[in-house]
Each structure stands twice: as structure tokens, then as C-alpha cells.
């Protein structure tokens, strides 16, 4: 079978490893950056608004794929939907909720309303014409099935290579410390960090480091930088600096208002760090509450403080949780397992020659 993978720039690192493992299993793959072969309106690059699909057509003609796999519903997926080649979508987030949030926040002006409506239209066309949708967690699978009652939908988690996550010296932090590694690009996710002031006040001896950036940074930073024990590091180079950061922290905290399958939660556990995460979306599927760390209720600084105190005051128990976390991620989300899941889903629905 010949599989063409169109990946977004933010996920191409992971898709390279995914494609490599599929090659080991006898699947001929070709991985491309999706926007290099298909773009148009809306696009951040004005010159691409009137792009033709000739590069995409040539790619299809030269490679002759049996199946096309994408990790987002953009122009590459849309062009695929116009062919007779089966389109398989790895759905990484709640597309419909994100469209709604965008309309309510960043896309209120008339030009941006037009753009978000076009993204919505493209997405619906891609979903409608796809052969298989693979949401990234069971929580998202349930949401997707409610929208597409007749469409094949199966969960496919994010694969991760444990060999990439090893302790590496570099970044030096003050201790004890809590590491937060998340972006501020979606307000409903980012605004959960506004519960931190109450925790920072109660834990003046604990240093909190936020590695991340995004359009909502300035809505968050002014409230947190008032505290001497809060430090903002900005966005970190991936994966090297992220690995150094996770090597150095004592506890990892995911403080998010909505999330499906945060990769950083997998990475922190592979780095043998005890984790604390907001109990939202698909987050509970990526950890064992009470075993590899703790889930905390949304908008509950009191519980966050209590769970952080448990981990920081019992170093030996926290260490054991971190060790269990690495084993949990290795066993459940390794490349070999997720690639087998992917191929089994294709076989189940007679997609490609498996």
C-alpha cells in the first residue's frame, strides 16, 4: 500500500517518526508539508490566496497513493476530497468548538468573519467526504460520532517515541519548582491559568515556570508576573530545550480549560515527572489519576494547591509516580502500538490494501 501523508508544520516532526515506523511494517509512505502542495484563501500568506492546485495534482500523479492521511482539515485535505483517493483524517482537537471560540474572540471583524466561515466550510466538506475520521481521544470520538452518525469514526491516540525523551542538562531552575508547558493560543484553554495567583500566594517558596507563548500571553502575564516566584520563559525550541526543561522541573502541571490529548502530558511522564492536570476533555485518558499524578477539577485553585503540596512534600512518592508515568506512556502510546491501531482501522473499513 502507498500512503501519502500531508502534515502541518507543527506536527511534521511526529509524523516523520510515524511514517518511519509504517515503512518498517511494509507500507510505502511519502510525507509532505501540506501547505507546500495545497493552499488558498484563507491563508496567512496573501500571495497564496490564489494558488492553483497544480503542485498537488503532480504529487498525486507521481506518487499514485492508495490512501491520503492528514492531520488537519485545510486545503490539502480539501483537494484530496475532490479525488477518488480515500481521505483519512486524524482529528487532533474539537474542530467545532474551536471554530465557535474563534468567532467569539479573535475573528469578530468582518474580514475575519469571512475567513472563519470559509475554514468552517472547508472543514465540513473534508469531514463529509472523508472515508474515516480518527479522533485523538475517546472524548473527541464521542463528540464526532454525535455529529456524523453514519461516518466511520475510531479513536487513534498520538504516538510518541520514548527514546526521544531522556534526561538532558542545560536549563537551570530554582527549586522546588513546578513546570508549565503550554501555549496561549486558545482563550478557553489559556484562561485556566488565571487561577494561579491564589496558588502562588500560598506557595511563596515554590517557583512556577511557564514555557509557552501565544496571542493571549498579555492577558495572563500581567497577573502572574506580580509574584516573585513566577517566571515566564517564552516558547522553547522543540524538542531539545523542551527536554532540558522537563529534565529540570520537579512537577509538571497542565493548567488548561479545555484539552483533548496534550502531547506535553505524555512527554512529561516519559521524563519521569509526576504530573498534575486539569480534569477536562481527553486528559484523563493520558494518565492514571493517583498513580502517575493527580487530576484536579477545573477552576479549583484550592485543589491544585493541595495536590501540588502532596507531591512537593513527599519526594519519594513523587519519584515513584514519575517512574509509573513513563511505563504507562511507553505501554499505551508507543509508535508500534499506534501504527498497528492505524493499520487495523484501515483494514476494518477496507481502506487501502492492508
PLM feature segments, named:
Residues 218-236:
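Nucleotide-activated donor-binding/catalytic signature segment of Leloir-type glycosyltransferases, i.e.
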Residues 4, 134, 170-191, 197-201, ...:
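Conserved donor-binding/catalytic core segment of Leloir-type glycosyltransferases
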Residues 83-105, 112:
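Active-site proximal beta-strand in glycosyltransferases
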Residues 289-290, 294-301, 310-316:
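Conserved acidic donor-binding segment of nucleotide-sugar-dependent glycosyltransferases
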Residues 257:
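Aromatic "clamp/platform" in nucleotide-sugar-dependent glycosyltransferases that forms part
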Residues 110-133:
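Membrane-proximal helix-turn-helix segments that form the acceptor-binding/catalytic region
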Residues 303, 310, 317-332, 338-344:
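A short, well-ordered alpha-helix in the C-terminal region of glycosyltransferases
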Residues 274-277:
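Short hydrophobic beta-strand element within catalytic cores of glycosyltransferases
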Amino acid at each position: 500500500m502507498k500512503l501519502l501523508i500531508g502534515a502541518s508544520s507543527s506536527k511534521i516532526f511526529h509524523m516523520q517518526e510515524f511514517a518511519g515506523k509504517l515503512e518498517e511494517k511494509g507500507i510505502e509512505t511519502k510525507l509532505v508539508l501540506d501547505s507546500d502542495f495545497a493552499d488558498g484563501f484563507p491563508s496567512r500568506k496573501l500571495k497564496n490566496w490564489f494558488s492553483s492546485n497544480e503542485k498537488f495534482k503532480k504529487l498525486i500523479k507521481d506518487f499514485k497513493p492508495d490512501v491520503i492521511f492528514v492531520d488537519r482539515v485545510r486545503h490539502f485535505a480539501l483537494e484530496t476530497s475532490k479525488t477518488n483517493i480515500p481521505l483519512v483524517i486524524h482529528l487532533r482537537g474539537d474542530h467545532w468548538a474551536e471554530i465557535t471560540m474563534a468567532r467569539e474572540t479573535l475573528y469578530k471583524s468582518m474580514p475575519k468573519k469571512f475567513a472563519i466561515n470559509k475554514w468552517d466550510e472547508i472543514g465540513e466538506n473534508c469531514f463529509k467526504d472523508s472515508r474515516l475520521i480518527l479522533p485523538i481521544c475517546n472524548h473527541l470520538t464521542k463528540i464526532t460520532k454525535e455529529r456524523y452518525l453514519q461516518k466511520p469514526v475510531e479513536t487513534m491516540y498520538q504516538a510518541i517515541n520514548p527514546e526521544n525523551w531522556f534526561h538532558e542538562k542545560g536549563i537551570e531552575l530554582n527549586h522546588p519548582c513546578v513546570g508549565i508547558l503550554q501555549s496561549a493560543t486558545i482563550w478557553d484553554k489559556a484562561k485556566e491559568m488565571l487561577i494561579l495567583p491564589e496558588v502562588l500566594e500560598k506557595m511563596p517558596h515554590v517557583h512556577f515556570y511557564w514555557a509557552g507563548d501565544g496571542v493571549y500571553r498579555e492577558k495572563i502575564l500581567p497577573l502572574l508576573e506580580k509574584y516573585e516566584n513566577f517566571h515566564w520563559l517564552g516558547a522553547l525550541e522543540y524538542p531539545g530545550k523542551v527536554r532540558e526543561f522537563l529534565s529540570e522541573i520537579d512537577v509538571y502541571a497542565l493548567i488548561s480549560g479545555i484539552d483533548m490529548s496534550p502531547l506535553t502530558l505524555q512527554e512529561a511522564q516519559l521524563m519521569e515527572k509526576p504530573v498534575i492536570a486539569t480534569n477536562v476533555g481527553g486528559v484523563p485518558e493520558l494518565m492514571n489519576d493517583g498513580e502517575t499524578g493527580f487530576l484536579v477539577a477545573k477552576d479549583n485553585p484550592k485543589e491544585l494547591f493541595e495536590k501540588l503540596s502532596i507531591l512537593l512534600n513527599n519526594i519519594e512518592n513523587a519519584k515513584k509516580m514519575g517512574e509509573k508515568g513513563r511505563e504507562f506512556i511507553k505501554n499505551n502510546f508507543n509508535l508500534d502500538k499506534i501504527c498497528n491501531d492505524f493499520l487495523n482501522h484501515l483494514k476494518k473499513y477496507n481502506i487501502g490494501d492492508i
